[in-house]
Amino acid sequence: MAAAQPESRDGAAQSAKPASETDPLSRFTCPVCLEVFEKPVQVPCGHVFCSACLQECLKPKKPVCGVCRSALAPGVRAVELERQIESIETSCHGCRKNFILSKIRAHVTSCSKYQNYIMEGVKATTKDASLQPRNIPNRYTFPCPYCPEKNFDQEGLVEHCKLTHSTDTKSVVCPICASMPWGDPSYRSANFMEHIQRRHRFSYDTFVDYDVDEDDMINQVLQRSIIDQ
């Protein structure tokens, strides 16, 4: 079986989101949903999207490519890229086990070690717990960081951003993280769409006791996310 390092074809290299060259998934990742391509389609500018993601991007009157901002039009099936996804192996960031690229989506939803990998990313943006308390925003509803829309629950905010702002590249503060006791209200995510889809697939408010310290809080989130798998 092939390793996840061959030269990319069908525009896969251009379609990949900005990522470390050491990430074997970066060349096979849809820039909209940030998952391994499903039914990849290559558009005229050379970039590649999942078929379903492309359909969403084509809905505006004047659709543009979310990667290069050129005019967007229906594309053609990326047959060679699809073949690679069905034959190339990569490893899970959590358990390090190898999987075919087409199977990695399903695996990470049930891998407890991958959940730990995700939470390490959350902790990387936290503040020192010894800082003075501050006014904490409403943790149950959130404003959109891109537009005036507000009063979204967590799931609603994720869906709104995916449908309305998937091509917006502006750096913004995550309103969900900013509402948490450990959150930094001045920290701007360089890729907010990736952040919100990878970090906020479950609700912190359901899982944590806000009276405990940061480490205990993170552990509570992890334990519940593992149980709920």
Swiss-Prot record:
Positions carrying N6-acetyllysine: K103, K113
Top-level taxon in the UniProt lineage: Eukaryota
SUPFAM superfamilies: RING/U-box
Gene Ontology cellular component annotations, sorted alphabetically: cytosol; nucleus; plasma membrane
Phenotypic effect of disruption: Mice show no significant difference of viral resistance or augmented antiviral responses compared to WT when both are infected with virus.
Zinc finger feature spans (RING-type): 30-69
Coiled coil stretches, renumbered: none
EC id: 2.3.2.27
Reaction equations catalysed: S-ubiquitinyl-[E2 ubiquitin-conjugating enzyme]-L-cysteine + [acceptor protein]-L-lysine = [E2 ubiquitin-conjugating enzyme]-L-cysteine + N(6)-ubiquitinyl-[acceptor protein]-L-lysine
Binding site for Zn(2+): C92, C95, H107, C111
UniProt cross-references to PROSITE patterns, sorted A to Z: ZF_C2HC_RNF (PS51803), ZF_RING_1 (PS00518), ZF_RING_2 (PS50089)
Region (Disordered): 1-23
Enzyme class name: transferase
Listed InterPro entries: Di19_Zn-bd, RNF114_RING-HC, RNF_E3_ubiq-protein_ligase, ZF_C2HC_RNF, Znf-RING_euk, Znf_C2H2_type, Znf_RING, Znf_RING/FYVE/PHD
GO BP, one annotated term: spermatogenesis
An annotated Gene Ontology molecular function: transferase activity
Keywords for this protein: Acetylation, Cytoplasm, Developmental protein, Differentiation, Metal-binding, Nucleus, Spermatogenesis, Transferase, Ubl conjugation, Ubl conjugation pathway, Zinc, Zinc-finger
Subcellular compartments: Cytoplasm; Nucleus
Zinc finger C2HC RNF-type: from-to: 92-111
PANTHER family: E3 UBIQUITIN-PROTEIN LIGASE RNF114, ZINC FINGER, RING/FYVE/PHD-TYPE
Subunit field text: Interacts with XAF1, the interaction increases XAF1 stability and proapoptotic effects, and may regulate IFN signaling.
The protein's role, per its UniProt record: E3 ubiquitin-protein ligase that promotes the ubiquitination of various substrates. In turn, participates in the regulation of many biological processes including cell cycle, apoptosis, osteoclastogenesis as well as innate or adaptive immunity. Acts as negative regulator of NF-kappa-B-dependent transcription by promoting the ubiquitination and stabilization of the NF-kappa-B inhibitor TNFAIP3. May promote the ubiquitination of TRAF6 as well. Also acts as a negative regulator of T-cell activation.
Protein known as: E3 ubiquitin-protein ligase RNF114
Native source species: Mus musculus
